[in-house]
Amino acid sequence: MSDRLSQLQEAVDQLMEQFIATYFYIDRHHDLKTFSPKDTIAPSKADQPPEVDTLPPDVFQAGQLELARDLITREQQIEYLISSLPGLDNSEQDQLQSIKELEEELNVAEKQRQEAVKEKDEVLVKLDQTLRSIRRY
Amino acid sequence: MADTEDDNSALASFFPDPPLFWKAFTPSNLQAYAEIKQQYASQHGIPVEDVVRVPDLPADSDLIYLQPPAEPKDGTWRLYGEPQSLEESLQPLESAGIERLGPPLPGSTTTSTSNTQTTTTDSQSTTQPTTDDTQPTSAFPSQQPTSQLPLPPSSTSAPGGASSGASSTQTHDTLHLHLKRLSKSLLLNFLELLGIMSLDPAAGSQKAADLRTLFLNFHHVLNEYRPHQAREQLIQLMQERLDQTRAETAANRAVAEKARRVLEGLGSVEIPAVDDVNIAGTGTGGGDGEAGYGSAAVPVPVPVGARTGTTVGDRRVGVDGEGAEEEEKMYWEREGMGWGVLDAEFA
């Protein structure tokens, strides 16, 4: 999983791809209209692929609806990602400050950890000795 | 003679020959170079492994081939015809010919002086018809101007270096709003594009260009935000590490404490017995005061032989705690009474 910033960038790229796909869908599957009653729609030639692949109105409507929904969903994802970007309230100085503090705390904690490990080892040795002497008995 | 032979073979062979300086890698040269490196390292007080390159080698010797070449002096070089720079920096939008929408991020010192100029170039470029097929390929045209106009390193390092060098106290709280505005504008512009295309397809290119500008701006803002995000992530990582370390310390202490309590409990019960055993040897000596019951027809308090001593030992290890001690005492009392009865009968 990548960080949120990369996720956001990918989401934006996907939004762009969806734009293109949506545009292509409408461009490809719309129906043809006449400007005046006298106009006629020329039948497409048999040896050429048709310019538009008109879908039945209800199918076309449904497709449009689905694509629009997808767009809105993607947009919502993007906005969610934007609002969850980390550390928008921190300035650079705040960040550097907290990094320094964390570093010191880490040093202290590491020392404490080593002490605890040493202590544990000592107790372990004692326990081991005791157990050994009992077993021998 | 040898040179001409080399040239001939280089022309004739299908694969190119290795570079000519491979002959410089003789054992004596390697030895000499290692010595120079060692000397250089000791002079500058750094470990030998950290010496990448010894400057000021005699230029006429073969030794210069034994180390990587120096960095380019002006910080730029070309790779596959593309100019590369030592300073990896984000190119400002304006210099890529893209109109900047909204305020620049805090920390980036990009000025908007060239704004009017870029807008004119932008509108000029939009006179070309832009179909949706060319859209994805033209979405990142920034490479084109860069390859034509390699910027001097001093000017490219300025915007990128400013954000890391001088730390700003401004926050990024306006970024939310800006990004949300941009994404909303994207949707709206796409809707407008569809509307325009349904009425007058020839006029759609302007809208497509707008969309392009919006997308580029979005990406640019995100890239400007990257250093900030990297620092943020570092903070998160350190916090996690800190928590982990503390948890480990606590767990270690808890275990040590528990073990010590067990030891103390054992010590109050067992340790005298352990000492007795250590003195008396491993159960073969019959002198221990507490072991003593079994087949020998002797009253209980009197010590008995070793055969029964081991069984007593086993039994004693099996139980522990104060309860065991009491049980032990009762056992001895019962046993003693039994032997007492026997003694009476015999007498």
From Swiss-Prot, chain A:
Residues 87-130 form a coiled coil. It holds the Pfam family Med21. Keywords: Activator, Coiled coil, Nucleus, Transcription, Transcription regulation. GO terms for molecular function: transcription coregulator activity. The keyword Transcription regulation applies. Residues 37-56 are annotated as: Disordered. Signal peptide: none annotated. The keyword Ligase does not apply. SUPFAM superfamilies: Mediator hinge subcomplex-like (SSF140718). It comes from the Eukaryota. It is found in: Nucleus. This is Mediator of RNA polymerase II transcription subunit 21.
From Swiss-Prot, chain B:
Its main location: nucleus. One of its GO terms (molecular function) is transcription coregulator activity. It is found in: Nucleus. Residues 108-171, 302-312 have a biased composition (Low complexity). It comes from the Eukaryota. Residues 97-172, 302-326 are annotated as: Disordered. Pfam families: Med7 (PF05983). One of its GO terms (biological process) is regulation of transcription by RNA polymerase II. Keywords: Activator, Nucleus, Transcription, Transcription regulation. InterPro entries: Med7/Med21-like, Mediatior_Med7, Mediatior_Med7_sf. GO terms for cellular component: core mediator complex; mediator complex. Belongs to the Mediator complex subunit 7 family. Component of the Mediator complex, a coactivator involved in the regulated transcription of nearly all RNA polymerase II-dependent genes. Mediator functions as a bridge to convey information from gene-specific regulatory proteins to the basal RNA polymerase II transcription machinery. Mediator is recruited to promoters by direct interactions with regulatory proteins and serves as a scaffold for the assembly of a functional preinitiation complex with RNA polymerase II and the general transcription factors. This is Mediator of RNA polymerase II transcription subunit 7. It comes from Neurospora crassa (strain ATCC 24698 / 74-OR23-1A / CBS 708.71 / DSM 1257 / FGSC 987).
